[in-house]
Curated annotation (Swiss-Prot):
Cofactor: Mg(2+)
Region forming the signal peptide: none
UniProt protein name: Ketol-acid reductoisomerase (NADP(+))
EC number, UniProt record: 1.1.1.86
SS bond partners: none
Chain positions recorded as Mg(2+) 2 binding sites: 192, 228, 232
Keyword entries, A-Z: Amino-acid biosynthesis, Branched-chain amino acid biosynthesis, Magnesium, Metal-binding, NADP, Oxidoreductase
Enzyme class of the recorded protein, top EC level: oxidoreductase
Stretches assigned to the KARI C-terminal knotted domain: 184-329
Residue numbers annotated as active site: 109
Amino acid sequence: MSVEVFYDDDADLGLIQGRTVAVIGYGSQGHAHALSLRDSGVDVVIGLPAGSKSRPKAEEQGLRVRTPAEAAAEADIIMILAPDTAQRALYTESIAPHLAAGKALFFGHGFNIRYGLIQPPADVDVAMVAPKGPGHLVRRQYVDGKGVPCLVAVEQDASGNAFGLALAYAKAIGGTRAGAIRTTFTEETETDLFGEQAVLCGGAAALVQTGFEVLTEAGYAPEVAYFECLHELKLIVDLMYEGGIARMRYSISDTAEYGDLSRGPRVIDSQVKERMRAILGEIRSGEFAREWVAEDEAGRPNFAKWRAESAAHPIEETGSKLRGMMSWVDRPITETA
């Protein structure tokens, strides 16, 4: 591999076991990090607002819960796992006043550091540990003695051993069992945003909706169009997930593969690639970040409008009816057992 990958033998858990880690936030990633850190012998404190609905859950699981400011004051390492748009105010109000020299500030995503929304003092370590999987999977793999690969990066090395500390954190949540890949805040942030916007969320959703529209506008039944453009997407993605595009093409019919190879490049052509490059350019220049921060500060008017418009798309009503015929989709995909 062209990247550096680190495993259990490369990480010293002792670097983190003698310290207190504050996990700020207790959502999907927060609960997985906190419980796995605790089970790895790390002293953990959860930082949540007094009225947070997650407080009882964290306390029921045997974790100490304090306000974000109290947790930050107590901790040697502060991991911020709150939503991107909440982090700047959270940092300014609750963390910065307690960020003494020698402490470490960790992130699960590089957005606020990459775009300068948070600017830590020079005398603290700034690092990132970002598992490449949802929190429930991170926790399940840890409990099973396995792990989820993660990205590890250092933006500021005040101590001289920030990367070693980040690797220790990754090991404590099971990441080095599978492999911790060294990256940078810039690379993680820019590729993550691009994947979300152009491929995984924006690109895929737009492709599915447009395909549904083409079929229904041509007179085909919405139910049949739903199956062909949305429902069966999972079958294809699962094959790609398990063994790449080659595995998918090996598993489908020759007719499907010929259509894939001969027609796919006509759908995603050089013009689409140029528009994808333009989207990447907006991410790299900071244009997207500035737009999103301004949208959030303005109360998210465009976001709310676009969300409502998408929710009203005919594919949603059709899908809701058809999923009533599918007993196997009653169980939430995030439910683990």
